[in-house]
Regions:
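Non-heme Fe(II) oxygenase catalytic core, chiefly the N-lobe of the double-stranded beta-helix
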Residues: 1-221, 226-258
């Protein structure tokens, strides 16, 4: 296995076939993902069934209601700009945070890449937490955030999660947020203050110095730890068709950092 550190965080990996891993090797890679937050597996030749098999080695799979399943691989969903007259809307978020046990890992497999653009951008939520002033860390230590669904026809779901989340493997503390549209209330403060604080924390999280921008290549499989990151698709300068297949691994109930 050959690895290269990405900047400012993340890891690129060569000479690993995710379709041919022992369970022990998959367990080791789960730790590698947690440590590096984002891992890019280069030159993967497998398809949907191989991606599903790899993800199942990391844990039970989960699927977000309202997404479009991949034909022949219903555990995966399609991420695509095909047939759209306007670019898809994407903002920084963490996946499906409004359920009791949000996904621990999300993976994307390259299917079709545009001639230009279409990066996936990640924020380091551990660095975002560490950059908070000490008074903020202490003052917000016991806060929870109500996460909610947006945009799912006829469906509404909410759940409260700690603002400062402890990672069960690395013992790091992350600033656990999603897009402000999905963070409806911060505990212990009035609605106006809640909205202002969530907006400030969110903007601090997505400063340019805190972002890894992934430029896709043929054969890429990218997997990240939702407990430690947010992500966004950059559709601002896409020239051509962009199709990815996504799978998610169920996580644990978020733990308060103490």
């Amino acid at each position: 296995m050959r690895t290269v550190k990405l900047s400012p965080f993340g890891l690129a990996v060569w000479d690993v076939d995710i379709a041919a891993l022992s369970q022990a090797a998959a367990d080791a890679l789960a730790g590698l993902i947690a440590i590096n937050k984002v891992v890019v597996f280069r030159n993967q030749s497998g398809g949907d069934s191989e991606l599903v098999g790899f993800l199942k080695q990391l844990g039970p799979l989960t699927f977000t209601a309202g997404e479009t399943p991949v034909a022949g691989a219903p555990d995966l969903n399609v991420v695509s700009n095909l047939g759209r007259s306007t670019p898809p809307r994407s903002v920084f978020h963490t996946d499906t945070s409004y359920v009791v046990c949000p996904p621990a890992f999300t993976a994307l497999r390259e299917v079709m890449l545009p001639a230009r653009g279409g990066q996936t951008v990640f924020s380091d939520q551990v660095a975002a937490f560490l950059a908070l002033p000490p008074a903020w860390r202490s003052g917000l230590a016991n806060c929870t955030v109500q996460h909610r669904t947006t945009g799912l026809d006829g469906q509404s779901q909410t759940h409260d999660h700690p603002l400062f989340r402890l990672h069960p493997v690395t013992a790091e503390t992350a600033l656990y947020l999603s897009t402000p549209e999905r963070c409806s209330h911060l505990s212990g403060v009035d609605p106006a203050t809640s909205e202002r604080l969530v907006s400030i924390l969110y903007r601090r999280s997505i400063r340019a110095s805190n972002l890894y921008r992934h430029s896709w290549k043929k054969g890429d499989v990218v997997i990240w730890d939702n407990r430690l990151t947010m992500h966004q698709a950059d559709h601002s300068d896409v020239d051509g068709d962009r199709v990815l297949h996504r799978g998610m691994v169920m996580g644990e109930r978020p733990i308060h950092a103490v």
